[in-house]
């Protein structure tokens, strides 16, 4: 089985390559061939990167379809994970990777006649809900038209529509979509700090806030999952050639008190959503930090997902709780952890 992982050096991509290497080792199945595609090569001396054959392709480039087609030839599945969260002040640059890049991957899958494509969607693709709406978990049939004030959500929703069209035009290709909650792991600490807090904020900040309370709006209720558990879901989707959409999230649902505990803080105090959104907007416009207010809208507006289908069809279960996944990330902040073979890109 030849599996190509596009975007194989990021938070999730590294975990997927690691899981595929483990599947080959645990099962003694040396026929599993892992091919990594990234914008730049990782350090092949670091695990798990040495377990894959590598190609460098910019998925948003004008020649991406031709280059990806050549890489995809003879593959049994393509797992598409490439994504750009930065620069948040330049949406066309993000669009080039996120939406144009996905269109290029799908076109190359069709041209190379790959039998399955697995695409990283997200809880962020779903239509938003209010506070009361978070009381009822939704399944994979919930509309995927996104949250209109969040660039990330807009791009994920656009890709869902692109996959709908691709699926209709190419019925012989198995199209699989994973829609995970927020994805955490220890080694992603430097990447996540750079993407959401900025490099002006030291990673050791978690050591300074333990005697503080966490100010958050009440609607900040969302799900998370460990990167290794998401990677396991990707492997199971490929191994079983499972079609359709799958919600991926661990228990329990995270809320302000649980978030405060994970950060080792004294507790949480409720503040108005409008206040936090305003602070984030001003500091983002002043370029003091890289997170735009759309991420506040995502945290406050995404629905809570049911994961029954992943359990029944994929046989998937989270091995880590959402709190364990977040605590691992927090520990990574304190230790300055980073993916060893692929440093975080700066926006």
Predicted regions, residues:
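Mid/C-terminal beta-alpha module of Rossmann-like enzyme folds, strongest
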Residues: 221, 230-291, 327-330, 336-346
